[in-house]
Structure formats: C-alpha cells, structure tokens
C-alpha cells in the first residue's frame, strides 16, 4: 500500500518539475532572441553609418562588418 501511495505521489509531482524546466527553457530562448535582435539592430545602425559614407559605391559590402545586411537592404554585391 505504501509503495502504491509513493508511486502515485511521484506521478503527481513529476509534471510539476518538468513543467518548470520547460518554462525555464522558453525564457532562455526568449532572452536569446532578444539579445539577437539587439545585436542585429546594432549591425543595422553600423551599416547605415557606413552606407552614408560610401554612398552608392559598392565598398559598403566589402569594407564593413555588415555585408549580409547591406546586400539584403540595398543592392547585390558582385
């Protein structure tokens, strides 16, 4: 009888502990996504600054650390 009660108690507690881990993982993913977006906006502003200096020349693509963003936002690089 004690064994059955113990087993039942474990079955009741188990979803509570795994649910906490799941929400922690989701919180970490949201935090990672927020950090990624912050980094992306920094890259975008750096690219905007570089774009103003190089105007319509194609040097923005190769000279700065924002190659993919410049390409997707402005024009294709050779």
UniProtKB/Swiss-Prot annotation:
Segment forming the signal sequence: 1-19
The keyword Disulfide bond appears for this protein: yes
Domain of life of the native organism: Eukaryota
GO MF terms, alphabetically ordered: ion channel inhibitor activity; toxin activity
Keyword Disulfide bond in record: yes
Cell compartment(s), UniProt: Secreted
Tissue expression as described in the entry: Expressed by the venom duct.
Pfam families attached to this UniProt entry: Conotoxin
Disulphide-bridged cysteine pairs: 47-61, 54-66, 60-70, 65-77
InterPro entries (UniProt xref): Conotoxin
Keyword entries, A-Z: Cleavage on pair of basic residues, Disulfide bond, Neurotoxin, Secreted, Signal, Toxin
Propeptide: 20-33
Location, primary (coarse class): secreted
GO cellular component, one term: extracellular region
Family, similarity comment: Belongs to the conotoxin I1 superfamily.
Entry domain remark: The cysteine framework is XI (C-C-CC-CC-C-C).
Protein name: Conotoxin Cl11.1
The species this protein was found in: Californiconus californicus
């Amino acid at each position: 009888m004690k064994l059955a009660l113990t087993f039942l108690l474990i079955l009741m507690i188990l979803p509570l502990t795994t649910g906490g881990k799941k929400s922690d993982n989701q919180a970490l993913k949201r935090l990672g996504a927020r950090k990624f977006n912050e980094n992306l906006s920094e890259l975008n502003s750096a690219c905007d600054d570089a774009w103003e200096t190089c105007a319509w020349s194609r040097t923005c693509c190769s000279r700065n650390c924002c190659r993919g963003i410049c390409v997707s936002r402005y024009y294709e690089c050779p």
